[in-house]
Amino acid sequence: MKTFAIPAYHRLAATVLLLSAAVSTARADEGQWQPHQLPQLKSELKRAGITIPAARLADLSKHPMSAIVALPGCSASFVSPDGLVVTNHHCAYGAIQRNTTPQRNYIVDGFLAQTRAQELPGGPNTLLYVTDRVENVTGRVLDGLDATLSGRARHDEVERRIKALVAECETDKAYRCAVPAFHRGGEYYRIRQLMIRDVRLVYAPADSVGNFGGDIDNYEFPRQAGDFAFLRAYVGRDGRPADPSPDNVPYRSKDFLAVSAEGLKAGDGILLAGYPGRTSRYRLPAEIRFARDVEYPARAASITADLETIAAATAGNPEHEVRYASVAKSLNNVLKKTRGLMDGFARKDIAALKDAQDAAFRTWYAAHGSGGPALLAELDAAIAADMALSREEAAWGEATHSDLLKSARTLVRLAIERQKPDAEREAGYQERDLAFIKARLTRLEQSFVPAVDGARYAAALARYARIDAAARPAGLDALLPPATGAKALVAASELGDTAKRLAWIGRAPEALRASTDPVIRLAVRTQDAAQALEDRRKDVDGNLERIIPRYMDAVIAWKRAQGKPVYPDANSTLRVSYGTVAPYTPRDGLVKGPFSTVQGILEKNTGKEPFNAPDKLLQAIRDERFGVFRDPLLRTVPVDFLSTADTTGGNSGSAVMNGRGDLVGLNFDSTYESITKDWYFDSAITRAIHVDVRYMLWVMKEVDHADNLLREMTIRYPKPVQRQKRAARGVGR
């Protein structure tokens, strides 16, 4: 069985027995918990082998939580006092791509800075966030709201209160604050994060290490991806965040994670901390069916067509292929996840399971609820309105699917919003957001080619024309260019020039309306339609925000009455999950995991992408230069491993820690059968995939010779005597 790669029969038999035991004892480790909830889980954490006091885990100022950080869309952690950060290779891909040229291809060859002076700028989108304060502000957001307000009026009042809370929090400009909703608007927490703006690329292995197996192995196991990279946070000499500058110095992180090369075995407990993006476990059956039958099939078809267009438009041009490498990688990841969701819904009728849960809840609510049947009727109507509007929003997405047009629309909206007092501007267009807008408009140059963008827009307009007329925003058709004219429209625009694009920042609406640039003219022409759609969304959301919190209060009470876990859906805020190292059975007669090894790289390697491992890595495997990273039972180096931890998108790069809080791996994926966990957690098949620290350290030592980083980190190596004793006793993985 490839997963184990064990040369001796008796070792294979012993491992299978251990795996069988692990399968039978794997527990339902459901929950993406807010840190302050962890003291309620003392017994569960103890059962999982976590020895860190729960009260300590709840304290963001103490180790290990103070070492957990966020990147845009990803998670990471400090691993040295000098701001060294470890995350996934795919999370650092934008920084790698930004510094890559056809002559100096860091995507293909990898990159290692032997000195601090050699570290490369991560670019305007590579930001680091350190959460240092979380406070419950539910009362300040919701108390005293007039129950008779319309949906739009309620939405606007809640937004006004949230903006005031954010402004109050951001008096120190080193911090970025937000007030996200939890439990679908039932609770609000104000979160303060130190925002570090100078983040540099330190080390990334070759793409054929970090992304070995590519999209073929994405969401699959066993796999052998070394999905890791290192960044470094820099600040001004006063220790405060500063714009990128050669005068900046490494950030002195208060805490950092030690790295354990001592290894794990099946059944060992792990703790995982990061910033999961979004789950939908409290959605109603109607919402599940909408996603299953409408949203996901349309998304899969659109992304498939978009990827085909990008491939055709960049073919034969290495520079264009590099420009769109990150875009294609991201789209492929979303596509495979979407198809996995569709397959998962086909394999297991989650909507029917939710029907049964919903029926049981409504029966309980009839006896215990305070809102009566009117609340549930209101809820069903609000959900129906939300789904109907979502169809039009999807059509709008196709009608405006041009990166250059999106930039023009940003400029038009910014000009309009800047006519208002700052507190009255739309969120995202306030003074606090100007640096982000400029960075976003600048960043376009990394992944933009006029001919490619024009081809993508032409294909998107053709897709839009095939959407049912009832699902297209009223009046939009007459405002759009013909699909046949999209390429010429993009080619004729001056916005493709970064300097000219940025020069429009701060211009008045009249100047934009007077522009002869065809893309700006299209953005101006469609602005009223965009505003109308946004206004309708605010009204729908306001109605949902009025009804759903009361519904969620009842659902929480119902779940607690059954002794079931109650945690909020993921929303890109700091969460903690726990689990055990465990295999799983995706189908009858097949047991997978929990470890893959470097032997699998030799078996899969074809010399052709995506199974084209570097020669120096292959030679190190053949020479068995495994050293202290050799597992005593596997007799080789583990690459990736499985656990029962509860994860989702955004958890990429999350620190996987052992029971005492040492880093033992990085989360980067989940199994294909697990993808529907965003909607329904099935403990039997839900497995997260992590890269093993031992493989990371082995690649750094034996393949890329990143000795400077190995010296910088605090690494707990296994004691030779202990390893020998364990091997003699036959203790396995």
Give the ranges of each region predicted by the language model.
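Positively charged n-region of N-terminal signal peptides that target proteins for export
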Residues: 1-7, 11
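Terminal presequence/propeptide segments associated with secretion/organelle targeting
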Residues: 2-4, 16, 23-733
